From Swiss-Prot:
Gene3D superfamilies: Probable inorganic polyphosphate/atp-NAD kinase, domain 1 (3.40.50.10330), Probable inorganic polyphosphate/atp-NAD kinase, domain 2 (2.60.200.30). GO terms for biological process: NAD metabolic process; NADP biosynthetic process. One of its GO terms (molecular function) is NAD binding. It is found in: Cytoplasm. Belongs to the NAD kinase family. Its EC number is 2.7.1.23. This is NAD kinase. HAMAP family: NAD_kinase (MF_00361). It catalyses: NAD(+) + ATP = ADP + NADP(+) + H(+).
Length: 296
């Protein structure tokens, strides 16, 4: 049986010794399999490898068949989101971080020789992860790489003071809120910031978006799950604080002023993630987050 993916990219978290060591191990293993390997520029610079093919993330997305991301969930979020902007290249996550909710392959010999080997042969399962995009006041656009979220888009106070929001969904008034902010999350992000704020867990394959209030000053404010085909308009209404902050997957802060409008909707691109054939999302919920753990 031949490999389904012949040109393989490696992307690692920068300035982390254990990641660099794993990248070197992975490179040697892939070489043994006779595969063509390209390493992301900064990832290669962190290793002792010489005379290797290197490329930017954009070049990797356009030239490679698959990308292996080594690191934690944060690095996976950043790399897979940027790769998806340029092509539909599938990604595989190898965990060298803490939780490893998205980077589902273990960083050990067994995972390389069995799990990764099988995936590269084409014996895998696939998750298509939706993303969100935003614009401010209909015309102020952030650079492309800073306007797409895989986990969530959050609007929060820049200091610890409440502010007001007015939310419309598909052009219809939905609700007002005063509090510390609002999270608009993809199903993938429902186990991240949104979950910490009391939101529901959504399966990554679900075609939904969840709006989760952050410390709403109300006894009856609850998360709201809507179709990912909906368009969400959020107006910044009043302030105790001079400004609020919009962030994407915890990065790329954009300052918002009073009376500005933020429009959020589904992005055209999706992230394609490859797992082992027997991957079970609900196993990951139980094992990584202790979901529905029986206590007695």
């Amino acid at each position: 049986m031949t490999f389904k993916y012949h040109k393989v990219a490696i992307v690692g978290k920068h300035y982390k010794k254990e990641v660099s060591q794993m990248v070197e191990t992975l490179y040697a293993y892939l070489q043994q399999q006779g595969l063509e390997i390209i390493i992301e520029n900064d990832t290669a610079a962190d290793t002792s490898l010489v005379n290797v093919a290197i490329a930017s993330l954009k070049e990797i997305a356009l030239r490679c068949d698959v990308a292996i991301v080594v690191g934690g969930d944060g690095n996976f979020l950043k790399a897979s989101r940027l790769l998806a902007l340029y092509s539909n290249i599938p990604v595989i996550g190898i965990n060298k971080g803490k939780l490893g909710f998205l980077t589902t392959l273990a960083a050990d010999d067994n995972a390389l020789k069995n799990d990764l080997y099988a995936i590269l042969k084409g014996d895998s399962s696939v998750t298509k992860m939706s993303m969100l995009k935003y614009r401010v006041d209909n015309n102020l656009r952030a650079p492309l790489e800073a306007s797409i979220a895989l986990n969530e888009i959050a609007i929060t106070a820049s200091r610890g003071l409440m502010f007001g929001l007015k939310v419309f969904i598909d052009g219809r008034y939905a609700f007002d809120q005063r509090g510390d902010g609002l999270i608009v999350s993809t199903p993938t992000g429902s186990t991240a910031h949104a979950m910490s704020a009391g939101g529901p867990i959504l399966n990554p394959n679900q075609n939904s978006v969840v709006l989760v209030p952050i410390c709403s000053h109300s006894l009856n404010s609850r998360p709201l799950v809507i179709s990912d085909e909906s368009v969400i308009d959020i107006y910044i209404t009043d302030y105790n604080d001079p400004e609020s902050v919009l962030s994407i997957d915890g990065r790329h802060d954009t300052i918002l002023k009073a009376h500005q409008k933020v429009t959020i909707q589904k992005a055209r691109k999706k992230v394609t993630v490859l797992h082992t054939k027997d991957y079970n999302y609900y196993d990951t919920l139980r094992e990584k987050l202790g979901w529905s753990k029986v206590l007695f």
